[in-house]
């Protein structure tokens, strides 16, 4: 798979899963390979399904989501970006959450726009392109 144009944050994948207005249409209109999710996002989605009162239904929905939105693994380049971003944010005294840090590093390493409705958190990361499809 070539680098995706968009890396979808957990909140956007949840909005897709829940069929929130505008999100499914936007994702479904993309060409194959234009959007993906980080394995970190996938882990957060699996955790949500594990904790769900409707576990089996949640996992069935996640299976369908994964068929549409591929999951990208982490490689050395992501680790390089993670270290650089974390160092920059710690020096500035503006850290972000650990999973968000990995997701930001993954998007930046892929040269993909991170699609999130949590732009306030991610705008601290230099060189990270952001899009909010919920507004």
Predicted regions and their residues:
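Residues at the C-termini of beta-strands that transition into short coil/loop
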Residues: 39-40, 75, 134
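Short, well-structured N-terminal submotif of metal-dependent ribonuclease cores
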Residues: 1-38, 47-64, 91
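Active-site neighborhoods of divalent-metal-dependent phosphate/nucleic-acid chemistry enzymes
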Residues: 2-4, 69-115
């Amino acid at each position: 798979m070539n680098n995706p144009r968009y890396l979808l944050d957990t909140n956007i994948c949840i909005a897709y899963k829940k069929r929130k207005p505008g999100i499914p249409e936007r994702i479904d209109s993309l060409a194959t390979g234009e959007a993906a999710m980080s394995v970190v996002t996938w882990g957060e989605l699996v955790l949500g399904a594990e904790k769900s009162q409707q576990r089996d239904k949640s996992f069935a929905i996640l299976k369908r989501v994964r068929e549409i939105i591929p999951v990208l693994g982490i490689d050395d380049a992501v680790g390089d970006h993670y270290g650089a971003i974390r160092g920059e944010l710690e020096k500035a005294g503006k850290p972000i959450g650990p999973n968000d840090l990995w997701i930001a590093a993954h998007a930046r390493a892929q040269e993909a726009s991170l699609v999130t409705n949590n732009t306030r958190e991610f705008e601290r990361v230099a060189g990270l392109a952001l899009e909010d499809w919920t507004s």
